Regions:
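Alpha-helical transmembrane segments and their cytosolic interface
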Residues: 1-25, 155-188
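Hydrophobic transmembrane alpha-helices
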Residues: 2-63
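Short helix-perturbing small/polar motifs within transmembrane alpha-helices
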Residues: 3-8, 23, 30, 87-135
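Membrane-helix interface segments
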Residues: 14, 59-64, 115-121, 148-149
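Hydrophobic alpha-helical transmembrane segments
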Residues: 18-23, 48, 52, 62-68, ...
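Generic alpha-helical transmembrane segments of integral inner-membrane proteins
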Residues: 22, 26, 30, 52, ...
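Interfacial aromatic-anchored transmembrane helix boundaries in multi-pass membrane proteins
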Residues: 32-42, 70-104
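Interfacial helix-loop-helix junctions of multi-pass membrane proteins
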Residues: 77-83, 140-154
Length: 188
């Protein structure tokens, strides 16, 4: 019986993996600035980039790119909508929606890996990822604001659903086209 161990063949966090995560962190930051201001929560394209991160980077890497985004925001880098940053933006009433980006990317990626990366498969994965994000964010908002859950959902989610449908359709279309190209190029 040999006691020799297998040679080390590489890290889960290779330079390529870290670079792709950094690119998607930057993409979320840029898409966060493309915004339409509304009273409660601004509409922006951040979730569009979150869906792409989940669908293209898969669960853990997609979530990692969002963890880095939140860490940058927490230390004050102005990566959030309206060039805001700082811990106060993450722990306020609507901070749960931003923290929910991590879960949205993870679940979108998990379901995309499990079901496949065709357009309709990605649409369903992104809808469920969005639902996880919205559940987490609405629960957070409800607890901090003292508003009942369904009232919070009606105020903070329902008005944004039409835009989310468009974001999901565009992100699924783009991801279903990009994934084979990125795989052929060895980037994923």
């Amino acid at each position: 019986m040999s006691t020799q161990t297998q040679p080390y063949t590489g890290s889960r966090f290779s330079a390529k993996t870290l670079t792709m995560c950094a690119i998607f962190t930057a993409l979320v930051a840029v898409c966060s600035q493309i915004t339409i201001p509304l009273p409660i929560i601004p509409i922006n394209l951040a979730l569009f980039a979150v869906y792409l991160a989940g669908a293209l980077l898969e669960p853990w890497r997609g979530a990692l790119s969002l963890v880095v985004y939140l860490l940058l925001a927490a230390v004050g880098v102005p990566v959030m909508a309206g060039f805001r940053g700082g811990l106060g933006n993450l722990v306020g009433n609507t901070g749960g929606y931003v923290v929910g980006y991590i879960f949205a990317a993870f679940f979108t990626g998990l379901l995309a890996v499990k079901w496949g990366s065709k357009f309709w498969q990605l649409c369903v994965a992104m809808v469920l990822g969005c639902a996880v994000c919205y559940f987490f964010g609405t629960l957070w908002y409800s607890i901090l604001s003292g508003t009942p859950f369904f009232a919070s959902f009606s105020a903070c989610v329902v008005p944004f659903l039409p835009c989310d449908v468009v974001k999901i359709l565009l992100a699924a279309l783009l991801a279903s086209r990009l994934r084979p190209v990125l795989l052929r190029q060895g980037l994923l």
